Amino acid sequence: GMAFDRADNLYVCIGGMGLYRITPDRKVEKVTDETNRSLYSVNDDSRLRLADDLDIADDGRIFFSEATVRYEMHEWPVDGLEARGNGRIICYNPATGTTHTVLRGLKFPNGICIASDGQSILFAETFGCSIKRYWFDGPKTGKVETVMDNLPGYPDNINLASDGNYWLAMVGMRSPALDLAWRMPGFRKRMGKRVPIDEWLFPNINTGCVIKFNERGEVLESFWDLQGVNHPMITSMREHRGYLYLGGISNNRIGRYKLDGADPNFIQYDRRWGKNQ
């Protein structure tokens, strides 16, 4: 995940390293690679293992997801097989230089986007097949609500659309066999012990999908590559000047799709910070 702040610094989540900043003059700086340790954790979980996606609040606070505290980036299928909440949402405050965990026990938290009220974030739980909303300011501070649940696939990054709604990448589609396996911990344990990892039950990552949704959890439109010919396993997308750009962690290409009726002048972080208006 990447996001620009008001001063055009680019903040980047790097799996296995933490949160970094790239200044306009291309200087790379480490922002943080740790958070507060869980109070009752036997293992020291203060180090960031898999920083994933981020967005920046109006006051400069950076909210970012850590998909799992137990596994490294290449081991994400193992986290999925374990099927429990190993992830967390973390906040870095540049005013104080401190980092702390705001939510934990999440099922592979992934995409993050500041909501329209400026007081909450929308975030995806990939293995929870859901989109949730967390309030960090205002009268609902600390509350979490479900925006969309029981999605047909596994949600990844979330980004703002030019019409004020949101784009969501679906990294893969669910299957009845894997859904059943997630309700059978004994079966998953035997599979993990006896079957090579490349033969495990796995999400259908041969389908590409992006959906647009609103804050009421309504799906407004969707785009599909059902056979995964051009863009399977879409993990990120960004609307920019009337086009939707598509990327995937295992893809060797960037896709571009013309959006009918989209704002041809829309640049996400220019609008976010009120530039060129």
Map each language-model feature to its residues.
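Short loop/turn segments that connect beta-strands within beta-propeller blades
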Residues: 23-27, 93-97, 135-140, 214-218, ...
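Surface loop/turn motifs at the tips and blade-to-blade linkers of beta-strand repeat domains
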Residues: 31-37, 41-47, 102-107, 147-151, ...
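Residue-level detector of Asp-centered blade-edge/turn motifs that repeat once per structural unit
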Residues: 4-7, 56-59, 116-118, 160-163, ...
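Conserved beta-propeller blade signature
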Residues: 9-11, 61-63, 120-123, 165-168, ...
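Asp-box/WD-like beta-propeller blade repeats and closely related beta-sheet repeat scaffolds
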Residues: 13-78, 86
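Beta-rich catalytic cores
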Residues: 50, 85, 108-110, 127, ...
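Short, conserved, GDST-rich strand-edge loop motifs in beta-rich repeat architectures
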Residues: 64-84, 171-204, 256
